[in-house]
Regions:
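Helix-loop-helix hairpins in multi-pass membrane proteins, especially solute transporters
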Residues: 70-207
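12-transmembrane solute porter fold
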Residues: 17-32, 37-41, 48, 52-53, ...
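Short, Lys/Arg-rich, polar N-terminal cytosolic tail immediately upstream
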Residues: 1-11
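Structural signature of transmembrane alpha-helices in multi-pass secondary transporters
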Residues: 30, 62, 66, 93, ...
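Hydrophobic transmembrane-helix bundles of small-molecule transporters
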Residues: 167-280, 287, 313, 483
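Hydrophobic transmembrane architecture of multi-pass small-molecule transporters
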Residues: 408-502, 507-516
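Signature of the 12-TM Major Facilitator Superfamily
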Residues: 21, 57, 69, 84-91, ...
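Transmembrane-helix signature of multi-pass solute transporters
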Residues: 92-102, 181-188, 246-250, 323, ...
């Protein structure tokens, strides 16, 4: 029986290659949807008979469903095995893609996206757990490098692909394109993926799961809608915040009183997992998600590029991530996960503090695109080693570890996106007000006179033109400050990496003294 020995010992080379390919196609397709849909949101409004605020629920629904479903995967794994969980995820994701593409109303689209988000969770968690188990311990860094290629390359590629589809075909094909890929992958996985059911039992605590789900959904809606509704000046935001905090407290109480806990908290006694969990939350969620959110906005709103052009300018970032992710995985196997993590931290912090924080209106768009290469190298060196570090000592807790890492990715990423949105608006308002305060009114009136007398504009149009220029400069300054602020969260996130580096050097000293 295959369950009697580790999965990696049961696979031939051909089986392992197919398993890797099948899992990565599924992961790439699912994670690509997290950013590719962001690009087409404005184009959905008229066909779905809604406004910008209404159509944003298309993104919020997907995110909340995915985050909620994540904690079910470990239970499903013990019931049916990872292969069936992966296949079920493909079925849900592909089927809901068809209904999303055919959506004629906002309610229809939101329902399809909820199912799609649920399917995405089943795909990414089962695929990562199975891929990690399919490789021998000395090659798991490479496996996570391949997985990291999908996790990081897909969202970076989303704006380019989404922009091209929206401009040259139709926005509905963003969903339809998943159907043939999903069907082929579904059939291949059904017939050729090995059955794999880890040897441990798990009983789902439905009470804890309910409270955690309510808390998570409430929190994510607060973070995604807070800026739009005016944060705590809104009764809805206040109510949802209270509901989220209360549900988290009830979840904690349920876990304390129950003998059958939703989460095996002994996982947090494993030092490497705790470090990776912290880094994933702050570096990936709070910081990198800000960068992923801000870059398309920078090229479109400040540089005036079309959606597709903006995607092309982000493409060097995506390609660099894809190129260096397997390299980082190989280094993790041969040396240590700490080496590529230190490289990733240094390059990412340098890029955010000294490159992105200088992106403004006057930075040539093409120059900005090529300046994203160091950032791409840093991100490429990040995903494989941090995942390998998190999972290498978990044993039967691997699926739980994967689930928790993806859960904190969703929650941290929602915080990061909310921070970027809030900071961008706040800094823009501050810059605009400061600009008005120090404005030389005599020169401003002279400029208006030139526009009216020599430019042939009416006084109202001339004033509007001047305000537009001031707003553009304020937005330019806001992008610089928001990018810079994103770096502080990454700085907080890398502190445990420095601790592990210190510990590893400390442990090397006695061994060197013994040899001497």
């Amino acid at each position: 029986m295959m369950e009697e020995k580790p999965l990696h010992e049961s696979l031939s080379t051909a089986q392992r290659v197919f398993l890797t390919f099948s899992l990565m196609v599924g992961v790439f397709m699912a994670i690509l949807d997290t950013t590719i849909v962001d690009i087409i949101v404005p184009k959905m409004m008229a066909p779905l008979s809604t406004d910008l605020y209404g159509v944003q629920w298309v993104i919020t629904a997907y995110m909340t469903a995915a985050a909620t479903a994540i904690m079910l995967v470990e239970w499903l794994e013990t019931k049916v095995g990872l292969k069936k969980v992966f296949i079920a995820g493909l079925f849900l994701f592909t089927t809901s893609s068809f209904f999303a593409g055919n959506a004629q109303s906002l309610e229809w689209m939101i329902t399809a996206r909820v199912v799609q988000g649920f399917g995405e969770s089943l795909i990414v968690v089962s695929a990562e757990a199975m891929l990690f188990s399919a490789y021998a311990p000395e090659k798991r860094g490479l496996a996570m490098g391949i997985y990291g290629l999908g996790v990081s390359f897909a969202p970076a590629l989303g704006p380019t692909l989404g922009g091209w589809i929206a401009e040259h075909i139709d926005w509905r094909w963003v969903f339809y394109i998943n159907i043939p890929i999903g069907i082929l992958n579904f059939l291949g996985a059904m017939f050729f993926l090995p059955d794999y059911k880890p040897k441990h039992t798990f009983r789902l605590n439905f009470v804890s799961f309910f409270f955690l789900s309510v808390a998570t959904v409430s929190l994510l809606i607060v973070l995604s809608k807070g800026q739009q509704l005016g944060w705590f000046s809104s009764e809805l935001i206040g109510y949802l915040t209270f509901l989220s905090i209360g549900s988290f407290l009830l979840f904690a109480l349920s876990e304390l009183l129950s003998k059958n806990r939703l989460i095996d908290y002994s996982i947090f006694r494993i030092k490497e997992f705790v470090v990776a969990f912290w880094v994933y939350c702050f570096v990936l969620g709070f910081s990198m998600y800000q960068v992923f959110y801000l870059l398309p906005l920078y090229f479109e709103r400040l540089k005036g590029l079309t959606t597709f052009q903006a995607g092309l300018h982000i493409l060097p970032l995506a390609l660099t991530i894809g190129l260096f992710s397997p390299v980082a995985g190989a280094i993790s196997d041969k040396k240590s996960s700490l080496i590529p993590l230190v490289i990733a931290s240094a390059l990412y912090l340098y890029s955010v503090f000294f490159i992105l924080s200088d992106f403004n209106y006057y930075t040539p768009a093409l120059k900005s695109a090529f300046l994203l290469v160091p950032l791409g190298i840093g991100m490429g060196f990040f995903f494989a080693p941090i995942t390998n570090l998190a999972l290498k000592n978990l044993g039967t807790k691997t699926t739980l570890g994967v689930s928790l890492m993806h859960y904190i990715r969703f929650v941290g990423g929602s915080f990061g996106t909310a921070l970027a949105t809030n900071d961008l608006q706040k800094f823009m308002a501050e810059s605009y007000d400061r600009m008005v305060e120090i404005q030389n009114y005599q020169r401003a009136w002279s400029f208006l006179e030139i526009l009216t007398e020599w430019g042939g504009l009416t006084e109202e149009k001339a004033k509007y033109y001047l305000q537009s220029i001031q707003s553009l400069y304020a937005l330019s300054d806001s992008f610089e400050r928001t990018f810079f602020n994103a770096g502080y969260w990454a700085l907080l996130g890398v502190i445990p990496i420095l601790y592990l580096l210190y510990q590893s050097k400390k442990s090397l000293k006695p061994s060197m003294n013994e040899r001497a």
